[in-house]
Amino acid sequence: MSLYQRTNFQSHPYHLVWPSPWPFYNSLSLFILTTSGVLTMHGFSNMYIILFIAFINLVWCMTLWFRDIISEGTYLGNHTNAVQRGLNLGVGLFIASEALFFLAIFWTFFHSSLSPNVELGAQWPPLGIKAIDPFELPLLNNIILLSSGVTVNSNYHSLIQGNRKGALYGLVATILLAIVFTIFQGIEYSVSSFTISDGVYGSCFYFSTGFHGFHVLIGTAFLSVGLWRLLGYHLTDHHHLGYESGILYWHFVDVVWLILYVCIYFWGY
């Protein structure tokens, strides 16, 4: 029916999106989540309750938004070839903008580390900072995340070759590796001898690794949606746009981590 209407009433192949409440609700949830998070960090009592509620609400709104997009593409056939080209372009521009964001972070790091001033003790890491050994937990995390890049590439090739079982195993392995990486990153933060308040080194370290960790969480969410769709037989060897976009995003996360490990952990040690 949708194809019939598009053929008879539309002179273009593009999908005219219906009015949706999810962009507004997600923005509102993010605003409340950010505000309550800042207030919790500054010691306001019971703000963690609002933080938790805002997080649950954000996850719920994202789930419903994913549901609508999946319905439009999988069941209604609104994602034509022209729409898919536009979505691919959007993903590419999004990854490019994220790359520029990380470029600014690395610029800040090298601005301070290549020529440390007197306030830093004229050395890097600054005087009084005990940097994390790059050959301990960071090296293990490096191996884990790069291994996840191998498994996610393996499950993609299994999918396009029609090997559904191999695709499922590879995707589950990737998600498990991502979860382990996130847990180890949290352990690293908990045992670190410096905080984000310890000068420019602490700010650069926690902001860069924390922002990357946030991207790992986003990538894990995308891959989890891909796993759910794979289990629901939504994906085929030639129709898997969202799944492929999630894999591209995950490779971007891998590349950023490799640069981050070499520059901040290894060279900055």
Curated annotation (Swiss-Prot):
Which regions form coiled coils?
Answer: none
Could you list this entry's UniProt keywords, alphabetically sorted.
Membrane, Mitochondrion, Mitochondrion inner membrane, Translocase, Transmembrane, Transmembrane helix
| PROSITE patterns named in the record | COX3
Report the SUPFAM superfamilies cross-referenced here: Cytochrome c oxidase subunit III-like
Membrane topology classification: Multi-pass membrane protein
What protein does this entry describe? Cytochrome c oxidase subunit 3
Q: Which family does it belong to?
A: Belongs to the cytochrome c oxidase subunit 3 family.
Enumerate the PANTHER family for this protein: CYTOCHROME C OXIDASE SUBUNIT 3, CYTOCHROME C OXIDASE SUBUNIT III
Sorted alphabetically, the Gene Ontology cellular component annotations on this record are:
mitochondrial inner membrane
Q: Which InterPro entries match?
A: Cyt_c/ubiquinol_Oxase_su3, Cyt_c_oxase_su3_dom, Cyt_c_oxidase-like_su3, Cyt_c_oxidase_su3-like_sf, Cyt_c_oxidase_su3_a-hlx
EC numbers = 7.1.1.9
